[in-house]
Amino acid sequence: MLKIIKYLYSITFVFILTIQSGPTYAIHPGWEEKEYNDVYTGEALNYIAFPIGGMGAGMFCLDGTGSISHLSVQNHPDFHNTPYTYAAIHVKGVKHGTKVLEGQVPFWKVFGPTQSGMGQGDKTYGLPRFQHASFQAKFPFSTIQLKDNEIPLAVKITGWSPFIPTDEDNSSLPLGLIEYQFTNTSTNILETTFSYNAKNFIDSKGNIKATKGGFKLVPRDINEDHGMAIYVDDANAQVDYCWFRGDWFDAQSIAWDRVSSDHITTNMPIEGVSPGASIFVPMTLQPGETKTISINFCWFFPNSNLTRGVATVTGEAFVKGPSQGTEPYQNDVTGFMGRQLLNSFRGGGDAVVGELVSDEFKINRRFLKFLVGGGNQPEKTSVNLIIDGKTVETAAGINSEAMSERIWDLQAYQGKTAKIKISDLSAYPWGHIMVDQFVLTDNKDENLSSPSSQALVLEDFEKPTLEGWTFQKPNKPIEDSGITDGIYAYRPWYASKFKDLQAVIHYWNQHKEQLRTSTELFRDAFFDSTLPAEVLEAISSNLSILKSTTVLRQHDGRFWAWEGSEDEIGSCHGSCTHVWNYAQALPHLFPAMERTMRETEFLINQNAEGHQNFRTNMPISRPSHDFHAAADGQLGGIMKVYRDWRISGNDEWLKSLYPAVKASLDYCIRTWDPHEKGSLTEPHHNTYDIEFWGADGMCTSFYTGALEAFVHMSEHLNKQAGKYKKLLKRSISCMDKELFNGEYYFQKTQWTGLKAKSPTEIPSFGSNYRHAEAQELLKTEGPKYQYGTGCLSDGIIGMWMASVCGLPEPLDQTHVKSHLNAVYQYNLRKNMYNHYNTQRPSYAMGGDGGLLLCTWPKGAKPTLPFVYSNEVWTGIEYQVASHLIMKGEVEKGLEIVRLCRNRYDGRHRNPFDEIECGHWYARAMSSYSILQALTGVRYDAVTKTMYINSQIGDFKSFISTDTGFGTIELKNNQPLLHVVYGQIDVKKYQIEHNNNH
C-alpha cells in the first residue's frame, strides 16, 4: 500500500530543504555568470522590484536595495510612484551612525525618470545609506542583507504578504509587511533608535491621523476611514504625526535632523495638512543579540472610476468641453491642430456616451475637411453631416489616437443648410471619438494647419466652451449591461469584506501569525524541490504577477485581469482569453478563482449564438458582440473547462457549463470551419491581434484540442458526441496530412473562395487597405499579417494546451516533436546582434538571447508577416520549453528557460517583472507548466488519481490541488506525497515510463 503523509498547517513540523543553485551561464560579454534562484548583488540589484500585496488589492514593491517603489494601492498602476518614505537606524556614540536602511541608489533612478535634470529633490536619494546590499527571493518572501563598515549591526530586511494556495480570500488582502531584523555584531551594548518616516504620499494635501503604533495617510476631503496605515507592533513606539511645516525642503530637513540626532519628537495629529510623520522605536541590543521590528502596511481604497465596456454615464460625453490633448488613462493623442480638440474620452474614458450637434451652416464651398481619431465604429462613434434631417456623410476613426485628415466632397449639396453631428454611442473599447479643425474650402489640398483666406473655419475648438453646439442625450441606456447590484465601476473585493481601514488593521492584527505560518508552508513546499534552479526561478518569479496591478478582483470575488500593466493604467483589459490561455499558475494554485473566469466567459461573455467576447467588461457584465471572437481564446476556453473540471472533480459545475460549451464549439465550427473539413479556413482572430486567413497549425491545433476535450466531456455526461468525433478525426488528418511539411506545421494562406468578404471589408485591428500600396500587396501576396510557410513557435500550441489540461495529444507525436525541434533549431538565438526588429525590440535585443516568434527557413516570407513576428515573448518561450521537455528534449527546453531568465538578471530588467505588452504580463505564467512538464505530475480529482510521467528520473516537486498542497516525490519508482496544507485524496497512482532519461 502506498503511504500518504498528511500534515495539517496547524501542526509543527520540520522541512529539510533541497534547493539547487544550478549551473551558471554567461549573460552578456563582460558580465559575470548568473546563478539561478540565488542571491543578487552589485549591478544585479539595479532593477529589482518585488511586488507585495494581495491579489487584486494593489501593491507596492520592495526594491533590491530595500527602498519602496511602484506604490499602486488606489486601484490602478502607478509604476513611477517612488514615495518619500524611508526606514532608518541611529546608533548612539558611533560616528556616521545614522543610516537609511537601504543600499546605495542605482544611478538609473537618478537620471532615468522624468524631471531627471531637476535634482530629484522630492526623493530620499541624498540621505546616507548602507554600503553593501544583497537580495534573495523565495516567493512570496524577499530578503535583503545590509552591511556597512561604520555600523556595528547586521541588518536583514524581509518583505512579504500572505499567499496561500486554495485560500484566495486571505491571499487577496490589502496589506504587506516589512520586517527589519538587527543583530549586534560588536562586543558592546548598543543603544539604537529605529525610525520609519514618510511624507503623506497618498495625498500631499491630505491629513495624517493616528492609529496604534503608527499613523494613517488620508486623502483630502475624505470623511470615511480610507487611506493607508503604517504602524509597528512594538509597545515602545513613539509617533510624530506632524513634521515641521514650512517651505522649500524644510519638512524633510527637520525630519532628518531629528532622526540623525536621536531627537524623538511626538507632535500630536492636527486638523489641517500635515507634511509627514515618523515612528520611533528605541532599542537596546546586547552583544550578539537580535531584535526585529515589523512595519505593517494596510490600505483601504474602496472606490474607483475604472470601467471597461459598461455605459455608466449616459449623455455625459463632451459636456466638459474641449480637451487639451491626451486625457488620463488614454494613449498619446497626436495630430490635432492648435492647443485643443474635441475628445469624448474626456470625463470618463470609453464609458461616457452622448452626442453633440452644431448650429446650422450654409454649404457654400466644395469641400469640408477635418481631422478625426478614435474608434472605428461608424454606427456608434462617428462624425456625420446632416442635411434635411438625414445623414449624408459619415466618418470614423481607425482605432487610433493619431488624428487623420478626412475630406467630404459637397458638390451635390451646394446652397443647402447642414449640421454636423458628433456621436459617441459606444461604451466599449475604442468607444470614443476625437475631432478637430472643420474647414470649408474650395481647395482639395487646403492646409488645415494654416487655412487660406478663402477658406472658412467652421470650428477649431480653441475656445474654452462649446459655443454653437448642442448636447443631445441618447433616449435610453446604450446597452443592457446586466448589472443588478448597482455597482457601475470597479470596487475591489476587500471593500466588500471590510467596512473601513480600521477593520483591515484589526483583521491583520488578529490573523497575522497564522497567515505567516500558512504562507511559509507554501514557500517551503515550493522550494523543497530537486527541479533545476532555473525552473524554480522562472516559476516563482512570475507568481509575482498575481500580486501585481495586472490582477483585479471585483466586489463579488470574481477574478478579472488586464493582460499586463502600463505605467498608470492596465494594459489591454478584460481577462483576455487568448492571453490567459497561457497562464497555468492560477488554475492550480487558486482553482476556485480560475473557475470564475470560465463562468464569466461562457455564461456572461457568450451570446445565444455562441459568439464569445474575448474581453470582459469591468464591472463584469454582458458585452456587445460587435467584433470577431478570438479563435485561439474561445477554443482554448473549451479545453480549460475540461482542465478546471478535472482539477475540481465537480461534475455539477461541468453540467452547468456544458450547454454553453457546446454552443461555443458549434459557433466555432459554423464560423471558421463551415464546411466541416477539420481546419479553420475562414479568417480567425488570434493572440497576434490580427486574423489568419486560411488553415494554420496554430489555431487548428486549438480546434483539434477543443474537439478532443468536448468529446471527453460529452462522454462523461452521457451526451451524444458522434458528430464531434468525426470532425476530430478530420481535424487530425488535416493537421498531419495537409498542414505538416515534413518538418513543421505551417499555414495555407487563403483569401478567396471563402464565405468571408474581402480583407478590405472585414473589421480588423490596423489591417486597413485604404492606400494603393496596401491594395497592390493584397493582389500579389494576399492579406497582410500571415505566416504562411513560416516556422511559428506557437505553431502547435493547441497540443501543448491539451497536455497541460490533462488531455491526450491526438496528433502524430513524431510530427509534434519534429515541429518543436524545428522551432528550437530555427527560432532560438543566443544573441540578437544580427537580428533586426522594427517592432518592439526591448523584449530582447543586443546581447540578449531568446526565442523568436517566427522564422522562415524555407523562404517565402511575406512582405508584411504578422505584426509581432520578430519579437521575443517570454510566455511563448516557456510554452515551447515545457512542450519540448514533455517530448523528452529536456536540455533544449532548459536552454530556452535559461536564455529567457538571463535577460531578467536585474541589471537591465526586473527579475520579477517579465514584460510583453506591459509589465507583469500574464502570458509569462506559462512558466508554471514546466513543473508539470518535468515531472508529469497531474492530480485528477474526478478519479482521485495522481499521474506521474517524469522526464528526469527521480525527483521531488511541489504540487497544488483544489483542496490542498504539498510535495510529491518519485524515488526508485515509488511515489510519496507529503500534504502540508489541506488534504489531497489519492486513491490511485499511475506512473508512466518513458525512455527519455
Predicted regions and their residues:
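Extended glycan-interaction surfaces of carbohydrate-active proteins
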Residues: 397, 532-567, 592-625, 671-695, ...
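Short Pro-Gly-centered flexible turn/kink motifs
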Residues: 59, 190-192, 284-299, 479, ...
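Polysaccharide-binding surfaces and accessory modules of carbohydrate-active proteins
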Residues: 162-261, 279, 306, 452, ...
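Short beta-strands within extracellular/lumenal beta-sheet-rich domains
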Residues: 279-281, 339-367, 378, 403-407
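Non-catalytic C-terminal accessory modules of carbohydrate-active enzymes
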Residues: 56, 67-69, 75-168, 844-847, ...
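Extracellular carbohydrate recognition and processing domains
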Residues: 385-433, 451
